[in-house]
Amino acid sequence: MRYVPLAELADAVRPTTALVAFSSVQSADGRVADLAAVRAAAAAHGARTLLDATQSAGWFPLDAGAYDYTVTGGFKFLLCPRGTSFLTVTEEVQETLPKLFAGWVAAGAPWTGNYGPLEHLAPGARGFDEPPAFLSYHGAEHSLALLGEIGTDALYAHATSLAARLRAGLVERGYEVVPGESAIVSVPGLEGRQPELAEAGIAVSAPAGNLRISCHLYNTEADVDRVLEVLGHREPRPSA
């Protein structure tokens, strides 16, 4: 296994690479991967692709079928209760992926075929299923219905518009932000301001030395302006 920086991922794919596993949007700072470049590099060398869409599903347009596997935690931008997650596997790859963790719901005949050795699994994706957390997925059903009603294009436009407003406001106030068009805005070295924002009722996080602020469907321009108000202008660095 090799770990490479995000910007070098596509160039790091080699003829000996079997699988490229990466996140569409980075949890640490919100950067968006060059999805097309990584897919092209993987295809050129016959490598499989596994995309973690946890930080993008729910606001970023994605075609799951463009990747051999996708995995997604539901509790982020999909607004699902904790305990929900989703896996997609292309039909081609399903034939080569062992169903190692299949439970009774994956049986070809769940109510009769799982007493004794589990010999026959359901065809297709259901053969990978495990018993779900029923209450969590009941909540997920409604969350996903809401997002589907709004539509990914509208969610993307709303979230990235707010993020762009926040990014511009931070730059005007002297802060250095991670560039890009993500719905996640990060300011390196500002993680120490997270408690102050929390006191003001603003929920942000501070991963990997960054102040990370995410915009989604429930946020407004007033929320963005409130963040800028609390942070204020960056204090000038002391001269040497």
Describe the residue ranges of each PLM region:
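Pyridoxal 5′-phosphate
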Residues: M1-A240
